[in-house]
A protein has these predicted regions:
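Intrinsically disordered, low-complexity regulatory regions
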Residues: 1-145
Length: 145
């Protein structure tokens, strides 16, 4: 283990969480990291509560910019790496894949939703991601749910 890049943020293939989060806005990067490491280090419910706090703060502040990509980086770079990172999630943690992809999408995707309406990342987080994480916390014996 390297203290700068601990094992709970790495995959078997060597990808690291920061390979995705470097392209994300602050709150969303923190939420992604806490969901990713949940159950890999310390108390899973506590990590999920921290992720929920970052997501709720992101939803509450629409004036804060979403992911800002440096020149030369395509919007698909982070999600593409994110997809590769999620392929390495162990079977027992597959529940994380959907909320992690929703966090990436909410922070970086602009355009239309599948129904043809404008995509709204904050609605996705509020209506799908937060309830899913709170349900998981409740299943772990936490208070949320």
């Amino acid at each position: 283990m390297n203290t700068i890049a601990p094992d709970h943020y790495k995959t078997e293939s060597g990808l690291q969480v920061w390979d995705v989060t470097r392209y994300m806005s602050g709150n969303m990067a923190q939420a992604f990291q806490y969901v990713y490491r949940a159950g890999r280090k310390g108390n899973e419910a506590e990590d999920l509560r921290k992720a929920v706090a970052f997501l709720e703060d992101w939803v509450a502040h629409p004036d804060v910019p979403r992911a800002v990509l440096p020149e030369g980086i395509e919007p698909t770079d982070g999600p593409s790496v994110g997809g590769c990172l999620l392929l390495d999630i162990p079977d027992g943690s597959q529940w994380k894949v959907q909320p992690l992809m929703q966090i990436i999408s909410a922070d970086s995707y602009e355009g239309e939703a599948m129904n043809g309406q404008p995509f709204c990342g904050r609605r996705l987080i509020t209506n799908e991601t937060l309830p899913r994480l709170k349900k998981r916390i409740a299943e772990l014996g936490g208070v949320d749910g």
